[in-house]
């Protein structure tokens, strides 16, 4: 069937060598996506690029400034850009397309990453029936990050033939039967599901802003770092918060959201109609997220041009929903060690 591939499909693709990797682990497969892992092959570059007319490797040879091995962990310095070959290669067929996104933990550390493929004129895009290597461009923007071979910074979602994104009419019908969002607001569905920011309590922490620090974070260390060394907690003033230029914030949604087990979701990362800021790095929501009682969406926010005032209940992002190609036997949650089920205002899994 057409639609977004599920857990069982990724198992099949790997078994049939449509996804190849010498270091593949079954734990990389999520309900409607697959985590991609870093190889040891890494390059420092001074300019970003796409490779619409060449292989990425051929273009890299001409522009890289330094070759690095990730056999041993290396420090990726803030605001420097690196290209790492991913362990996974693709040999797709049967009209399969897709795209990639940073994982939640990557976005919450303000690590900007995007996938580059051979003969492809768009970042993050998996062209129809793609065959070839995959590379990841990585720029860490708030902290120096220790990166190792095998780390998983991004994820891939594949589809059979076309996207089956649901229109507003379909979403409203589903929302009446099985809530997609828990709120008393009206007009919550408009060009997707509208998600607003929670600045309702002036006496509680509503956000974190990344501190300037020389301390380093090892991407492999989980539940390890003290929050106060890297983040400053913020409280709203008069139910408002000023987003300062070039600073990085973690906030949460006012509403709880739900991704039913027969659907997948994706946050739209930048919407000029909502405001001049990036409202989310990590896009994918797997089936079962927040099911059945809802879970808050955590939002990564940054503005590049001017300071921006956010008010309580202001729309900050949109979620679009898409149909799965079949019912999945695995959903997001504790059974597959999902890190952010039932989350509140949550930093990345690296902090305790």
Question: What are the functions of these language-model segments?
Answer:
Residues 1-352:
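DUTPase catalytic domain/fold
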């Amino acid at each position: 069937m057409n639609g977004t591939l599920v857990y069982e499909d990724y198992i099949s693709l790997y078994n049939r060598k449509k996804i190849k990797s010498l270091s593949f682990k079954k734990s990389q497969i999520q309900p409607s996506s697959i985590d991609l892992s870093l190889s040891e092959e890494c390059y420092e570059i001074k300019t970003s690029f796409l490779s619409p007319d060449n292989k990425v490797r051929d273009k890299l040879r001409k522009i890289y400034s330094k070759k690095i091995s990730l056999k041993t962990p290396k420090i990726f310095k803030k605001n420097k850009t690196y290209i790492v070959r991913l362990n996974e290669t693709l040999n797709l067929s049967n009209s399969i397309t897709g795209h990639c996104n940073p994982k939640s933990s990557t976005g919450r550390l303000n690590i900007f990453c995007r996938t580059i493929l051979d003969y492809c004129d768009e970042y993050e895009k998996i062209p129809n029936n793609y065959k070839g290597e995959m590379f990841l461009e990585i720029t860490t923007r708030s902290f120096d990050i220790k990166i190792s071979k095998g780390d998983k910074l991004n994820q891939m979602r594949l589809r059979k033939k076309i996207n089956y994104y649901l229109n507003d009419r379909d979403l409203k019908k589903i929302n009446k039967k099985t809530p997609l969002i828990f709120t008393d607001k009206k007009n919550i569905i408009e060009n997707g599901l509208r998600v607003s920011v929670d600045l309702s309590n002036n006496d509680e922490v509503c956000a974190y802003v990344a501190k300037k620090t020389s301390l380093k974070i090892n991407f492999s260390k989980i539940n390890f770092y003290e929050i106060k060394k890297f983040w400053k907690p913020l409280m709203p003033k008069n139910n408002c918060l000023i987003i300062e230029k070039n600073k990085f914030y973690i906030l949460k949604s006012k509403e709880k959201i739900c991704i039913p087990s027969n659907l997948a979701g994706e946050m739209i990362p930048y919407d000029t109609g909502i405001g001049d800021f990036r409202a989310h790095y990590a896009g994918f929501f797997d089936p079962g997220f927040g099911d059945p009682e809802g879970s808050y969406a955590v939002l990564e926010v940054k503005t590049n041009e001017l300071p921006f005032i956010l008010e309580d209940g202001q729309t900050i992002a949109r979620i679009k929903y898409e149909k799965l190609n079949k019912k999945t036997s695995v959903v997001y949650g504790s059974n597959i060690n999902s890190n952010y089920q039932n989350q509140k205002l949550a930093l990345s899994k690296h902090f305790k």
